[in-house]
């Protein structure tokens, strides 16, 4: 491989794999690895057991591998195995390894043949292995067998995709030679996720089970059905061999003998078999790790940056420091106070861009919700006139009055002012609710100290409740002050002299019409909900609201006006959301029981959020469109019953004139009261509740916490937080160490280019059968070459393969005694398994004694 650093690459990734698997970050990091993919009977498990030289994988009928097995092979002087979930325990008996795999599988999936994507990490140390990391995945199947779930095919496919879709995962596609290779499940999956073939390595098993007269020579030479990284053939133990306890050492010797003696494969013998496959995978994985090092390093750096800020507070953590808890308590209280102030004042460093929070929500209560609640409690026009007429008549008593009595004005105003108490109390309740939510939000940073968080929330919430009572008393006092004295000398009050004059002016204005430019109150998108039902769905229009009318256009350019609706006699009502609707709806209707728009009694308008609805309602209030009150229908029926009174009132011109005068006076005075209440309510709540709570947190919260009792109990750390801190610190140090190692290796290695692309269109056509010799015209960029061929297109430097003796004239090259005798596959020239031998086709079949040795 060129240097020692490259040899350390696979152990490095193994260490990363263990470290990040332990803290649940493996999927995010996407470490380089080899995923073994194939059908249920393709021979995947046998290939892995041949690598290790031991029987250690579960066997049986149906689906046996039900969880991914991350198999980490480490070259060492002693032979043993370790599981990540059994840290510190060494397994020297590989039968125990098999039982532990089965037990660990059942612990997660149960015993009902279910599957799980949670991997089992197994590390095998042995002098007979090369450094390698593979992931054994469940075999693909089409039909459920026994008690397998009906959708087992899709479950397994989903699990495979979780691994093979990662760019850093090499795919070991295992296919049996005795079935149609063009229909191989493994190659189909590989083609789907790796269309360029840059990550796929082909393995052909069961070469000894092919029909007589057939072979896979052209496939192994990468002429038929070529892959970019080529194919390697292996011969595994048969079921009879397994039942007969034939050991893997003998099986490897038999495999070697098979390739040396078979006339179709003997010229490829040095590039076939399990030992050679292991070497190639070691080289391919090493090269792949080196190629992915820059991307891996970038990911590690980004993860390190993302946790560095959080780890900063843990770095200097000293659990045995006696002053630690006191310092932490002071810091937590100070942080809580600062967060609360920032959330209320709106200068927080973490600004929510999705919804209103903290002070912004309280601001909306003050300036949208509270005015809306005030107007909801305002008088109904017809009802008010009827009350005024009764008040005037009752004040005059038996006499017929000549003048408009001011007592009627005072009685009516007091009744209207009294109604302001309910929305004022509701405003306080809404602010208390928002303050409590803000306290909970601010205390989220205290989750590492659950007792402290609980106690702090309790103390502050109790204080808010105390201030709530005081604030409500003050609010009631404000309303009572308004009731105590009617200031008819107020500069904004029109007075008796101007009341009639104003009434006349209003009548003239209505008669002449407003010719001046009308002030626009609001513009925005609204969906007309009910009209679109008959026309294929609701539609969105651009609405423009003024004091006189409501218009809507096709778009916000306001060129194509769809309709204009007068706001006179309009009212608002809420509409319940539909079963499948996510929009919030309100409706406009006419108080005189007329159609609002064409044949529709009401116009339903929809918004995306409740905040938008509230904002539109507040805008309609400014235009004089008030919400419907609960008792409107009953009052309407009462008005109909008392219709004779109304007619009688209207028949008396003097009474009608007096009612109009009082009506104008009440309207003028209530406007003053409303303005005063709307101005003083936020100020009262701010002073008595919000600012007071802020001062309490800054000055008294710490003293209250100290008086609660034992500070050690208060500052007990949650088990989850302690575990999280340990995990974050472990991850932080693992990331730093990994970056250090990667940095050293990346600067001392030489890049090896990828094998050239091949014609893999056969994976899409899937019409060529395997198992038969292909004609020499099979689509491939490679052909058999003479003994000393010139450099071919696509070659890169000296060709790998057998020793130079293979180029001797006339005779066949001597077959190396074992795969290890071939040139070092980790040398500078790339080892491309798909390249055929340069030896002449005719190879004598005399036995070679040196081919009997077994790789150690």
Swiss-Prot record:
GDP binds at residues 41, 43-46, 59-60, 206, 208, 211, 236-237, 239. Residues 28-294 form the Dynamin-type G domain. Residues 519-625 form the PH domain. It is an enzyme of class 3 (hydrolase). Phosphorylation at Ser-774 by GSK3B/GSK3-beta leads to inactivation of receptor-mediated endocytosis in non-neuronal cells. Dephosphorylation at Ser-774, through the EGFR downstream signaling, leads to activation and regulates early stages of clathrin-mediated endocytosis (CME). Residues 64-66 are annotated as: G2 motif. CDD domains: DLP_1 (cd08771), PH_dynamin (cd01256). Residues 136-139 are annotated as: G3 motif. Keywords: Cell membrane, Cell projection, Coated pit, Cytoplasmic vesicle, Endocytosis, GTP-binding, Hydrolase, Membrane, Methylation, Microtubule, Motor protein, Nitration, Nucleotide-binding, Phosphoprotein, Synapse. Residues 825-844 have a biased composition (Pro residues). The dynamin-type G mediates homodimerization and plays a role in self-assembly. The C-terminal proline-rich domain (PRD) mediates interaction with SH3-binding partners. Is required for DNM1 self-assembly. PANTHER family: DYNAMIN, DYNAMIN-1. Homodimer; homodimerization is mediated by the dynamin-type G domain which promotes assembly-stimulated GTPase activity. Homo-tetramer formed from two dimers in the absence of lipid. Oligomerizes into a helical polymer that self-assembles around the vesicle membrane, when associated to the menbrane through lipid binding. Belongs to the TRAFAC class dynamin-like GTPase superfamily. Dynamin/Fzo/YdjA family. Residues 38-45 are annotated as: G1 motif. Residues 659-750 form the GED domain. Residues 750-856 are annotated as: Disordered. Residues 235-238 are annotated as: G5 motif. GO terms for biological process: negative regulation of exocytosis; receptor internalization; synaptic vesicle budding from presynaptic endocytic zone membrane. The keyword Membrane applies. The gene is DNM1. This is Dynamin-1. Its EC number is 3.6.5.5. The modification Omega-N-methylarginine is found at residue 796. One of its GO terms (molecular function) is GTP binding. Catalyzes the hydrolysis of GTP and utilizes this energy to mediate vesicle scission and participates in many forms of endocytosis, such as clathrin-mediated endocytosis or synaptic vesicle endocytosis as well as rapid endocytosis (RE). Associates to the membrane, through lipid binding, and self-assembles into rings and stacks of interconnected rings through oligomerization to form a helical polymer around the vesicle membrane leading to constriction of invaginated coated pits around their necks.
């Amino acid at each position: 491989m060129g240097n020692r650093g490259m040899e350390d690459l696979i152990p490095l990734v193994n260490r990363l794999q263990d470290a990040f698997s332990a803290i649940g970050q493996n999927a995010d990091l996407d470490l380089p690895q080899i995923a073994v993919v194939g059908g249920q009977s393709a021979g995947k498990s046998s290939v892995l057991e041949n690598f290790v030289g031991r029987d250690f994988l579960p066997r049986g009928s149906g689906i046996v591998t039900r969880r991914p097995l991350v198999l980490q092979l480490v070259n060492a002087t002693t032979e043993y195995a370790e599981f990540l979930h059994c840290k510190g325990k060494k397994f020297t008996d590989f039968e125990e390894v098999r039982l532990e795999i089965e037990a660990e599988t059942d612990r997660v999936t149960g015993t009902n043949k279910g599957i799980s994507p949670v991997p089992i990490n197994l590390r095998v140390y042995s002098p007979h292995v090369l450094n390698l990391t593979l992931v054994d995945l469940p075999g693909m199947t089409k039909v459920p067998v026994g008690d397998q779930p009906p959708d087992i095919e899709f479950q397994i496919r989903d699990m495979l995709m979780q691994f093979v879709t990662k760019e850093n995962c090499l795919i070991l596609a295992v296919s049996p030679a005795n079935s149609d290779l063009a229909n191989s499940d493994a190659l189909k999956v590989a083609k789907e996720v790796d269309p360029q073939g840059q990550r796929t390595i082909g393995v052909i098993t069961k070469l000894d089970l092919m029909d007589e007269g057939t072979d896979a020579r052209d496939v192994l030479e990468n002429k038929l059905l070529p892959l970019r990284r080529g194919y390697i053939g292996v011969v595994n133990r048969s079921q009879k061999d397994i039942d007969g306890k034939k050991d893997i050492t003998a099986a490897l010797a038999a495999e070697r003998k098979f390739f040396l003696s078979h006339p179709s494969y003997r010229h490829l013998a040095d590039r076939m078999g399990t030992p050679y496959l292991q070497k190639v995978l070691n080289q391919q994985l090493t090269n792949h790790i080196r190629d992915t090092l820059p991307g891996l390093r970038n990911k590690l750096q980004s993860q390190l940056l993302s946790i560095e800020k959080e780890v900063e507070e843990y770095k200097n953590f000293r659990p045995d420091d006696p002053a630690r808890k006191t310092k932490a308590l002071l810091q937590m209280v100070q942080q809580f106070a600062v967060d609360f102030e920032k959330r209320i004042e709106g200068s927080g460093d973490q600004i929510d861009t999705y919804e209103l929070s903290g002070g912004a929500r309280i601001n909306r209560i003050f300036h949208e919700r509270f005015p809306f609640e005030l107007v909801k409690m305002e008088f109904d026009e017809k009802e008010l006139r009827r009350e005024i007429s009764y008040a005037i008549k009752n004040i005059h008593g038996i006499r017929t009055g000549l003048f408009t009595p001011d007592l009627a004005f005072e009685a009516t105003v007091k009744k209207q002012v009294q109604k302001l108490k309910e929305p004022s109390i509701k405003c306080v309740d809404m602010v208390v609710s928002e303050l409590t939510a803000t306290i909970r939000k601010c205390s989220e940073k205290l989750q590492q100290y659950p007792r402290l968080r609980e106690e702090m929330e309790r103390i502050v919430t109790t204080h808010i409740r105390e201030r709530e009572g005081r604030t409500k008393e003050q609010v009631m006092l404000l309303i009572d002050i308004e009731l105590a004295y009617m200031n008819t000398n107020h500069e904004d009050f029109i007075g008796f002299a101007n009341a009639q004059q104003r009434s006349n002016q209003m009548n003239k204005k209505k008669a002449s019409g407003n010719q001046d430019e009308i002030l626009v109150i609001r513009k925005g998108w609204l969906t007309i909900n009910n009209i679109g039902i008959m026309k294929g769905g609701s539609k969105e229009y651009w609405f423009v609201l003024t004091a006189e009318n409501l218009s809507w256009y096709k778009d916000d350019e306001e060129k194509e006006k769809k309709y204009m609706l007068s706001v006179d006699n309009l009212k608002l009502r809420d509409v319940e959301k539909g079963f499948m609707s996510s929009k919030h709806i309100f409706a406009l209707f006419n108080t005189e029981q007329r159609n609002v728009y064409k044949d529709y009694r009401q116009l339903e308008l929809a918004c995306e959020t409740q905040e938008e609805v509230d904002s539109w309602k507040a805008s309609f209030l400014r235009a004089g469109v008030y919400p419907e009150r609960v008792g409107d229908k009953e009052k309407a029926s009462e008005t109909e019953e008392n219709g004779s009174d109304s007619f009688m009132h209207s028949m008396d011109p003097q009474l009608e004139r007096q009612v109009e005068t009082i009506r104008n006076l009440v309207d003028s005075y209530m406007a003053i009261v409303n303005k005063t209440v709307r101005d003083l309510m936020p100020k009262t709540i701010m002073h008595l509740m919000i600012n007071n709570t802020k001062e309490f947190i800054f000055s008294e919260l710490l003293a209250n916490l100290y008086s609660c009792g034992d500070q050690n109990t208060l500052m007990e750390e949650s088990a989850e937080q302690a575990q999280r801190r340990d995990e974050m610190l472990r991850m932080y140090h693992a990331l730093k160490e990994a970056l250090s190692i990667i940095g050293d290796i990346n600067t001392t290695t030489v890049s090896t280019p990828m094998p050239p692309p091949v014609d893999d269109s056969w994976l899409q056509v899937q019409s060529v059968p395997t198992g038969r010799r292909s004609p020499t015209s099979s689509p491939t960029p490679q052909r058999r070459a003479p003994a000393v061929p010139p450099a071919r297109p696509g070659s890169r430097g000296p060709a790998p393969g057998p020793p130079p003796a293979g180029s001797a004239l006339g005779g066949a090259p001597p077959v190396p005694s074992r795969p290890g005798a071939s040139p070092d596959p980790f040398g500078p020239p790339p080892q491309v398994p798909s390249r055929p031998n340069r030896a002449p086709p005719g190879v004598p079949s005399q036995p070679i004694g040196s081919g009997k040795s077994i790789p150690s």
